[in-house]
Amino acid sequence: MNENIESVKKYNLWFGNTIDCGFPRPLYTENVASYLGSKVVKVLTGQRRVGKSYILRQTAMHLVQQGISSNNIVFINRELTAFDFIENYKDLDNFIRLYREELKPEGRIYIFIDEVQDIDGWERVVNSLSQDYTEDYEIFITGSNSKMFSGELSSLLSGRYVEFHIFPLSYGEYASIHQLPVGRESYLTYMADGGYPELVHFQSSDVKRNYISGLKDTVLLKDIIRRYTIRDVRLLEDLFAYLVNNSSNLLSVTNITNFIKSKGRKTSYDTVSLYLGYIEEVYLAHRALRYNIKGKEILSGSCKYYMNDLSFKNYLYAGFGYGAG
């Protein structure tokens, strides 16, 4: 067996292997399942650690339960060192070819690629496979950056992909996992804990705080600082903290810039605007624009930011700013 196939087989369902599928999240898996059988590319987007990988695995297990051979399902996860040999689209194309030679799947092949943006030029292979009329592929990908469809791929796959945005656990999911009755007390517990799935396994507040701190640092470092070569890392971190502590308040780039300058920091409107955009792109925060109901138009300038999860506020900046909003 090829050494690359050998190194990744334990992360696949081949040879009777089993994989951890986490907590059932039917809100998403049932939606994805409604598109099974079509060749449109299924795209799961969302911040790191919200559970995209588990939803992929749950979808794969659904296929197996429907009678699809496990040899027809292949997982690729660029966050795992076992897949480090897949650096670019040529490596990805070669791996899929090797997989076909080694496993010899018959019929439709289901390809799951996790954190696809970490493969340089990935869109070339995804586009090629999705349009290959000589072979039968169905492709599922996840990504942690909202700009993954902003360029060439949006044109290449126009009308041939469907996107599912994945959020942290909802209150209903949280209550179900913890087997809590729905009500005010469990809701307040959810608001205090936050919805990142991994937090379910932790009991200590210190452990949860360390996890959330590490998550924040990972997203800022991997998805922003390295990707965009950030020059002022401290400014990026300060802007993130500012958004957390002013979540749901009416803000503008101008007043944020003025606030930073009032603290004796050197920056500019353009830099602040750019960094805020990066924070949005990796789904750490969501921007809500002002809407003029009477004029039926979006008003420029002020807007509100909402964090992807309350855990950043609760565990990292609990002593500052306003409440949950």
Language-model segments: what does each one mean?
Residues 44:
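Hydrophobic anchor at the beta1->P-loop junction of P-loop NTPases
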Residues 1-38:
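A short, basic N-terminal segment
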Residues 48-49:
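Walker A (P-loop) phosphate-binding loop of P-loop NTPases
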Residues 2-9, 17, 144-146, 150-250, ...:
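Interdomain motor-coupling "hinge/lid" segment immediately C-terminal to the ATP-binding subdomain
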Residues 72, 205-325:
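Accessory nucleic acid-recognition modules appended to NTPase machines
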Residues 74-107:
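Short glycine-rich substrate-engagement loop in P-loop NTPases that contacts/grips substrate
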Residues 53:
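Walker A/P-loop
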Residues 123-141, 154-155:
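Conserved catalytic/switch belt of AAA+ P-loop NTPases
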